[in-house]
Amino acid sequence: MSLRAFMLCVCLLLQSVGARPASELQNLERLLQDQLSSTEHPEEDRLDRTREEPQLGGSSSREAADESALTRLFADLLRTSKRSWGRYKKGGMRSCFGVRLERIGSFSGLGC
């Protein structure tokens, strides 16, 4: 096959592929447009959600449970980090056999 024929086939193939957008691209474009419109009109979205909530029947309680679980998780992480910070500040690094000792027998935290 000659180079001219090959280039002609490639050009025709690119022309046919590029002539119409793929359905995935159309879906992506539609999603992006929806996202842009939702950021432009947050008041309307809030009104739409309040209208939809009675139809969903309990989604607000599920969302509240998810939010409370997330809040508990973050609160637990904050409490844990404060406790571990206090250990490092007072006693230094912990090892498998307990805390670092300045005097023998001053702590009884031996063991893994």
Curated annotation (Swiss-Prot):
**Hey, what's the signal peptide range on this chain?**
1-19
Q: What is its main location?
A: secreted
Q: Kindly list the cysteine pairs connected by disulfide bridges.
A: 96-112
| Listed GO biological process terms | blood vessel diameter maintenance; cGMP biosynthetic process; receptor guanylyl cyclase signaling pathway
The record's listing under InterPro entries reads: C_natriurtcpep, Natr_peptide, Natr_peptide_CS
A GO term, aspect molecular function: hormone activity
Q: In which tissues is it expressed?
A: Spinal cord, kidney, ovary, heart and spleen, and to a lower extent in brain and liver.
Please give the residue ranges the record annotates as the region Disordered: 33-67
Residue ranges with Basic and acidic residues bias: 40-54
The propeptide segment or segments lie at: 20-90
Q: Where in the cell is it found?
A: Secreted
Checking Pfam families in the record gives:
ANP
Protein keywords: Cleavage on pair of basic residues, Disulfide bond, Hormone, Secreted, Signal, Vasoactive
Please give an example of a GO cellular component term from this record.
extracellular region
The yes or no answer to whether the keyword Protein biosynthesis is present is: no
Looking up PANTHER family in the UniProt record yields: C-TYPE NATRIURETIC PEPTIDE (PTHR12167), C-TYPE NATRIURETIC PEPTIDE 3-LIKE PRECURSOR (PTHR12167:SF5)
What does the sequence similarity comment in the record state about its family? Belongs to the natriuretic peptide family.
What's this chain's function? Exhibits natriuretic and vasodepressant activity. Has cGMP-stimulating activity. May help to regulate body fluid homeostasis in a variety of aquatic environments.
What is the name of the protein in this document? C-type natriuretic peptide 3
* Organism field: Oryzias latipes
Encoded by which gene?
Answer: cnp-3
